[in-house]
Amino acid sequence: MYNLFKSVIETDRSAVVICDVNHKIVYMNKMAVTRYHKDLTGSSLLDCHNAKSNEIIVKVVDWFRQSPKNNMIYTYHNTKENKDVYMVALRDDEENLIGYYEKHEYRNPETAELYDFSKSLI
């Protein structure tokens, strides 16, 4: 089963970077390594962003911790690449937060408000 799941991630055309709850990068798919020009596995995601971005990342992860219903939040639209970007909670079978990742969806613009903490999108 592991190989099936890994294959899904590895064949995704979007960069996939998975972090644990302490912001440590635990996995990058091939597209992520290509996009960011190196494998950052083992590094802190917070070392890859500026202070303002780090503040938002920490706030989102805190929101994920508040409720098992808080699982996905819209973060921005990239007009140049026509994609929406989300942060997504990863949970174990007991719905405990075990990590998160950034999801890129290439499509029409999102209709939700940016960082709308009043609802989860999934």
Mark where each language-model region is.
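Non-catalytic regulatory/interaction regions at protein termini and inter-domain linkers
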Residues: 120-122
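Sensory modules in modular signal-transduction proteins
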Residues: 1-32
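Sensory/regulatory domains in signal-transduction proteins
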Residues: 27, 31-116
